[in-house]
Amino acid sequence: MSSLSKEAELVHQALLARGLETPLRKPELDAETRKTRIQAHMTEVMHLLNLDLTDDSLADTPRRIAKMYVDEIFSGLDYENFPKITLIQNKMKVDEMVTVRDITLTSTCEHHFVTIDGKATVAYIPKDSVIGLSKINRIVQFFAQRPQVQERLTQQILLALQTLLGTNNVAVSIDAVHYCVKARGIRDATSATTTTSLGGLFKSSQNTRQEFLRAVRHHG
């Protein structure tokens, strides 16, 4: 992790200190080598499923999956992909809640490697800095691009923003459909899971907490 940005390193260390980091091994192979290895293993998996990889529809599937894993849906495992963060001095002395609603996220259940599909609402009360609004979306997407459990994902986003913004006054709520529930097992096609993580005033002040929860419930 020698080439990490300062912000990526701060967030990674904060998550480690709190026991909230995704279980990770120290990286040993570069991205291209990992893709080559994954492609070989996926070829074997497909053979074991009795799929005919000489068919032109399936022939390139192992390579596609390997590229998708490393470059896309699991790209958040590599902190070199942590978004560039823009912080602006809070010269306007903004001290009211800033909320970004309906942030689209797609993640992967770490137990079955199937889709988690949902939306996040993130709020914070600025202290010394404000953050570019799109950066909140990018932070959500970074941590979603990993094998995840929703509870940890919610807390990772919270702690990352607390670390970057220098304030505990952050709140995160995620509402998501888990395809490990929808497409297998119980096969419940209508249920969704909501997780919330609150810090600072969002936890200690009932009024602030209720204002955030109203924003989460607002759809009009």
From Swiss-Prot:
- Carries keyword Ribonucleoprotein? no
Binding positions for Zn(2+)?
A: 109, 112, 180
Q: Write out the entry's keywords from A to Z.
A: GTP-binding, Hydrolase, Metal-binding, Nucleotide-binding, One-carbon metabolism, Zinc
Q: Does the keyword Glycosyltransferase apply?
A: no
According to its UniProt record, which protein family does this protein belong to?
Belongs to the GTP cyclohydrolase I family.
| PANTHER family membership | GTP CYCLOHYDROLASE 1, GTP CYCLOHYDROLASE I
Question: Assembly state and interactors?
Answer: Toroid-shaped homodecamer, composed of two pentamers of five dimers.
Indicate what this protein is called per its UniProt record. GTP cyclohydrolase 1
